[in-house]
Amino acid sequence: MKDASHRVFKDRLYGQFARIGKALGNPHRLELLELLAQGERSVDALATESGLTLANASQHLQALRQAGLIESRKDGLFVHYRLADPAVFELSRGLRTVSERR
């Protein structure tokens, strides 16, 4: 029984790893994460700062949110995004460090 529950745990964990990896597999999403590492921003601000259309930025943000990397909150007509956890900043920083060294 313990082996079965351990297998379920590992399957869920590696499934989440894969979802995160897929979400990070796009350069625009990585840039959006870097912008959000500097603080909460609206979709409009993120689109402007990243050079994306509003629709394209929204699609990328949705993928990051579905992977659990960012969270959103609504403020009237505006949606603001932020990193879901400080560990997301560490992940982003680690990826940047590895990329700069390679």
Walk through the language-model features, giving the residues of each.
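N-terminal helix-turn-helix DNA-binding core of bacterial DNA-binding proteins
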Residues: 15-55, 74-87
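A generic alpha-helix structural signal
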Residues: 18-21, 61, 92
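Amphipathic alpha-helical dimerization/coiled-coil segments
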Residues: 1-16, 34, 86-102
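Alpha-helical residues within the helix-turn-helix
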Residues: 48, 59, 65-66
